[in-house]
Regions:
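Short, solvent-exposed secondary-structure boundary/capping segments
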Residues: 103-110
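Active-site glycine-rich loop that binds ribose-phosphate moieties when present
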Residues: 111-130, 158-160
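A glycine-rich beta-to-alpha transition motif near the start of alpha/beta enzyme domains, typified by
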Residues: 1-102, 141-166
């Protein structure tokens, strides 16, 4: 499934047949030797809400929570009749509310745990202002004009900058 440019392999694991999600993610998400995806989403049983989401990055690391992945698993659960149009699921110990609207999914995210003051990062001769935001899943937020004065995304080497900033 695809969510805003991220692609995921989604598996119903309520039977708990998959015991090592990290190992499976490394194999199945490999774009050369596997199916290929940004991550693996396992839909598991929950005693609190409709289901629990376990998210693994393509390298097998535990991702905790991913908004795009959350929207994908919510649509998957609805399409497979695991959950209704409006439902709740668990991820990383938190409860998220999802609403299916035709082909779109609305997802209520957790309020940020912390937001840093503006910090600066030197990359070569460039000094970039950024903020760190922890929404239970860490994010770095940078104003696009730091890279391109007109704020245009065309020509921005996102993969290069993503690797540097990660």
């Amino acid at each position: 499934m695809s969510g805003a440019g991220n692609d995921f392999i989604v598996i119903d694991n309520r039977s708990a047949m998959i015991v090592d999600g990290a190992a499976l993610a490394r194999k199945i998400c490999d774009r050369h030797w596997g199916v290929g995806a940004d991550g693996l989403l396992l839909l598991e049983s929950s005693d609190k809400v409709s289901y629990r989401m376990m998210y693994y990055n393509a390298d097998g690391s535990y991702g905790g929570m991913c908004g795009n992945g959350g929207r994908c698993i919510a649509m998957f659960a609805f399409q497979k009749k695991i959950a209704g149009k409006d439902h709740k699921f668990e991820a990383l110990g938190h409860i998220y509310a999802a609403s299916i609207m035709a082909e779109d999914v609305s997802l209520n995210m957790q309020d940020p745990v912390s937001i840093s003051k503006i910090r600066y990062l030197s990359i070569g001769k460039k000094k970039i202002a950024y903020q760190f935001i922890d929404t239970v899943s860490p994010h770095i937020v940078i104003d696009i004009t730091e890279f391109n004065k007109n704020g245009d995304l065309d020509g921005l080497d996102i993969k290069r900058w993503g690797k540097i900033l990660r």
